[in-house]
Amino acid sequence: IREELKRCSDLVQSITGKPTTLFRPPYGEYNDEVVRISREEGYECIQWNVDSLDWKNISAEDMVRRCTKNVNPGDIVLFHNDSKYILQALPQILEYYQRAGYRVIPISELLLEGETWIDHAGTQHLATPPPSASTGNESRKIEQ
């Protein structure tokens, strides 16, 4: 895990000139160990709660529908830069968000400050009071 984090971070920094502090576990799969190690290495594990399904090459219309239906403040929408219809769907999605009064912001502005913990659904919570029912092995696998 540490090696993969470092390799990816080094690559991003070599391209952008900026260090990374956030990462999305591949396929959304993670457990307490991944979160612990990422934090020890200075990273915050980020999940999403709205999947555009762009990776399945669904139509732009279906993507727009998925990303605008039941959207809420603080939602994180997953997109991929190589999806087939993202260039057609994204302007419509962003226009919808703007009309609905939402602002698209960097994830770094969504994160809670201070000690936090992440529940089984990938939602960040303040650590005070600390979670009382942690099993020590919380994990999540995204099912599509």
Predicted feature locations:
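Active-site-proximal beta-strand/loop segments in catalytic clefts of secreted hydrolases
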Residues: 24-28, 48-51, 79-83, 107-110
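Periplasmic/luminal catalytic loop of GT-C fold multi-pass membrane glycosyltransferases
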Residues: 77-78, 97
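C-terminal domain-boundary segment and adjacent tail
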Residues: 85-144
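Alpha-helical scaffold elements lining the catalytic groove of polysaccharide deacetylases
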Residues: 1-19, 29-75, 86-89
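Residues at or immediately flanking beta-strands
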Residues: 19-22, 103
